Amino acid sequence: MIKVYAPASIGNVSVGFDVLGAAVSPVNGALLGDCVTVRAAKSFSLRNEGQFVGKLPEKLEHNIVYQCWQLFCQHLGKQLPVEMTLEKNMPIGSGLGSSACSVVAGLMALNEFAGLPFNESQLLAMMGELEGRISGSIHYDNVAPCYLGGLQLIMEQGDIICQPVPSFDEWLWVMAYPGIKVSTAEARAILPVKYSKQDVIDHGRFLAGFIHACHTRQPALAARLMKDVVAEPYRTQLLPGFANARETAKRVGALACGISGSGPTLFSICNDIATAEEIAEWLQQHYVQNDEGFVHICRLDLAGARQIG
């Protein structure tokens, strides 16, 4: 029996639209992510469980973990008779890399069970392929950090898909999911077809500056450069209360604040626990809209997906 946990992730991280992603895990040790278990069997079967099992598609062929099994067997060149269990702990359409969690946990668990027939690069390429089928185009900004951990810069240059970016251990990431769903397709459709030359210049400046600040260990500069001129100005209208929450977080003492992926999850970066707790409490009271919403104080998950059973 193999059981794999894949953590939540932040796509874009404000400054790197489609090219930057970060894996996160709560500081209290809670598992914020999906788990997939693989056991030997006479034929394939899939069981779903977990907090958000009710949000999964009813048809087997639409289930991401079933699609993982299909793709894995296709690349393996033979059918793998296994019993799989998806523990769906990630809300769908949350901006926390929910589909990536299932993709990464599913494919990694199958690879471990089969005796590691595929190396890390091959498996990551498979993850990107499947994520592309789900979202309509290949994006690694969730699957790469979810699988490999930490902060990842997506390059897609031949066999080099991504590279790790140094992060700051002192940063705490307050993650607030309001409990509503935002469609990734809708969030992409709202973006302009063309951007001004000034926006392009600013985007390049902020992203290059942020990566430089990370490598040269300048956390204050890195936080100051976490500005999104590509998506946030347009997606804010899809997120009730986001603008007010962002301003409140910064007033309380957040170093930076932004939209996680397509939203509606908000992330806020702090460098001390007292500030993080104050922001988390405010977000719980004012940004979370229902019982499905939650707030977690996290750090970057440097381990990424891992076998836990």
Swiss-Prot record:
Keyword Cytoplasm: yes
Location within or outside the cell: Cytoplasm
Any Gene Ontology biological process: threonine biosynthetic process
Pathway assignment: Amino-acid biosynthesis; L-threonine biosynthesis; L-threonine from L-aspartate: step 4/5
Residues that coordinate or bind ATP: P91, I92, G93, S94, G95, L96, G97, S98, S99, A100, C101
Enzyme Commission number, as recorded: 2.7.1.39
Catalytic reaction equation(s): L-homoserine + ATP = O-phospho-L-homoserine + ADP + H(+)
PANTHER family membership: HOMOSERINE KINASE, HOMOSERINE/4-DIPHOSPHOCYTIDYL-2-C-METHYL-D-ERYTHRITOL KINASE
NCBIfam families: PRK01212.1-4, thrB
Name assigned to this protein: Homoserine kinase
Lineage: Bacteria, Pseudomonadati, Pseudomonadota, Gammaproteobacteria, Enterobacterales
